[in-house]
Amino acid sequence: MAILKLRNVAYQAGQKQILQNVSFEVEEGAFLTLIGPSGAGKSTILKLIANLINPTSGKIFFREKDIMKIDPLIYRRSVSYCFQQPSLFGEKVADNLSFPYEVRKQAVDRKRLLQLLHEVSLEADYLDKDVTSLS
């Protein structure tokens, strides 16, 4: 059974047509490689699948459900996107660990942040360290 289906997906940025009538299926457990020249739309397809951008037309299904109708928090437990260029969400370690709380408009749980540091063998003072000082 296909875990992912794209049906006639198109994407347009301004006046530029990036993708047109893209359709394919990925079976559960399968690997998929997207190959093409720079600007061919590979990253755009991945951003569409991750629901970071919306298709101009067409549908994307995950486990037989239209991804536009799945709660984004639930969808992101199964599907994510790793950017080609790493992105950080502030200057301090605490800024980056707090980001998920901010996205969900929740109060930052400092106790949980300290627990996360402990799980990776880092001391509490790392919360205030500049991210560029870490390797």
Tell where the protein language model's regions lie, with residue ranges.
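Helix-to-loop junction immediately C-terminal to a conserved catalytic motif
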Residues: A50
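Conserved catalytic motifs of ABC-family nucleotide-binding domains
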Residues: P86-D95, R104-K105
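Conserved ABC transporter NBD signature motif
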Residues: G58-D66, Y75
